[in-house]
């Protein structure tokens, strides 16, 4: 009998083992769809980004008008740009839900997979930041100025690092050209990290909602989960196209319709919605270095999740107290996101400070304590 090409060919064998014959827990819920959705987001962003890069000019005098030209004169240029800009939002929605799933179901106990995942998040954040600067509108320019300036809080070498990153003494043409280069490079780095992420995941196999070993009861990925993933794609691409076609500027900042002007500061400098929670944490500390450290800690704290897991059960499925804390954390992040979009004045300052304190308290203190308490209550 002729050998099955799918199982013998060196390249097809890899595809087969990760997408076709992959043994998968039969009970993984829709929360396990976000990994493949992130893959689709990445593919869409690289494709639309490539098409945009063909019409973009990375020069301070031409960047703004080249983007306008793309939207006005290029065939479907407006659609490509709207899909790319809103695709970024969906990328972040998916990655935040994916991380939330990981925290809820204890997926972080696959340490290598979890750590590469955090590296993916950091790379995605860097990509989105440099990408936001490219249209060279007011918020692009001032966002770049404010965020790069944070590095000057590093003692002794900070100012040198900032001027090195800028390629001069302010955000200018060299900054824009290198940001374009980085924005082109980083998505491919994300793609590479994704392969590493999947390699580590396939070492252990997927976790499942019960958090128990499922080796005795697995089903092939195709057709069951390939079909389920396609349903997920449909359910994500529908709101994405709806947003891109009906209200493409809903999530953007109106300031960015004004070309960058170093002499006029916008009244409220704020990042895109997906960075607002971290921005609120940054602003909640009235000291520059302290704020920068808190900002870094707000994301890097995820590296500690595997070390802070004190429960004998893996998931939160049967741990009501931990569940309560988890959903308080989610609500807290939504409050931080809202506060980040508000001006720095009376009620918002104290709300932001309390929400920031709560964020770190839940992750560092309350969740581990609750895990230990639940062990005791269940006589483990």
UniProtKB/Swiss-Prot annotation:
This is Cytochrome b. It is a multi-pass membrane protein. GO terms for cellular component: mitochondrial inner membrane; respiratory chain complex III. Heme b b566 binds at residues 98, 197. Binds 2 heme b groups non-covalently. PROSITE patterns: CYTB_CTER (PS51003), CYTB_NTER (PS51002). The cytochrome bc1 complex contains 11 subunits: 3 respiratory subunits (MT-CYB, CYC1 and UQCRFS1), 2 core proteins (UQCRC1 and UQCRC2) and 6 low-molecular weight proteins (UQCRH/QCR6, UQCRB/QCR7, UQCRQ/QCR8, UQCR10/QCR9, UQCR11/QCR10 and a cleavage product of UQCRFS1). This cytochrome bc1 complex then forms a dimer.
């Amino acid at each position: 009998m002729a050998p099955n090409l799918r199982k013998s060919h060196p390249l097809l064998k890899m595809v087969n083992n990760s997408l076709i014959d992959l043994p998968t827990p039969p009970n993984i819920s829709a929360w396990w769809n976000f990994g493949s959705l992130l893959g689709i987001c990445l593919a869409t962003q690289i494709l639309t980004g490539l098409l945009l890069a063909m019409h973009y000019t990375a020069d301070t005098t031409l960047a703004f008008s080249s983007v306008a030209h793309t939207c006005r004169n290029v065939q479907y240029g407006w659609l490509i740009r709207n899909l790319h800009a809103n695709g970024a939002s969906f990328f972040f929605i998916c990655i935040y839900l994916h991380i939330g799933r990981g925290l809820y179901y204890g997926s972080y106990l696959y340490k290598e997979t979890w750590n590469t995942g955090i590296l993916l998040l950091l790379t995605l954040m860097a990509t989105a930041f440099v990408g936001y600067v490219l249209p060279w509108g007011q918020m692009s320019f001032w966002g770049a100025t404010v965020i790069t300036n944070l590095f000057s809080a590093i003692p002794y070498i900070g100012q040198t690092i900032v001027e090195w990153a800028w390629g001069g003494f302010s955000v200018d043409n060299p900054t824009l050209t290198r940001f374009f280069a980085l924005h082109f490079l980083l998505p491919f780095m994300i793609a590479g990290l994704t392969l590493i992420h999947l390699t580590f995941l396939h070492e252990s196999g997927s976790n499942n909602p019960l958090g128990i070993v499922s080796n005795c009861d697995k089903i092939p990925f195709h057709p069951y989960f390939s079909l389920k993933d396609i349903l997920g794609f449909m359910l994500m691409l529908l709101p994405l196209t709806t947003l891109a076609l009906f209200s493409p500027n809903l999530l953007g900042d109106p300031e960015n319709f004004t070309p960058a002007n170093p002499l006029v500061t916008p009244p409220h400098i704020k990042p895109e919605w997906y960075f607002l929670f971290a921005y609120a944490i940054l602003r909640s500390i009235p000291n520059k270095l302290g704020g920068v450290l808190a900002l870094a800690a707000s994301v890097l704290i995820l590296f500690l999740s595997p070390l802070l897991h004190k429960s004998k059960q893996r998931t939160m499925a049967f741990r009501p107290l931990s569940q309560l804390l988890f959903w308080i954390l989610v609500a807290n992040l939504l409050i931080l996101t809202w506060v980040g979009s508000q001006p720095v004045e009376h009620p918002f300052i104290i709300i932001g400070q309390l929400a920031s304190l709560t964020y770190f308290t839940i992750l560092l203190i309350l969740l581990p304590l609750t895990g230990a308490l639940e062990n005791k209550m269940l006589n483990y």
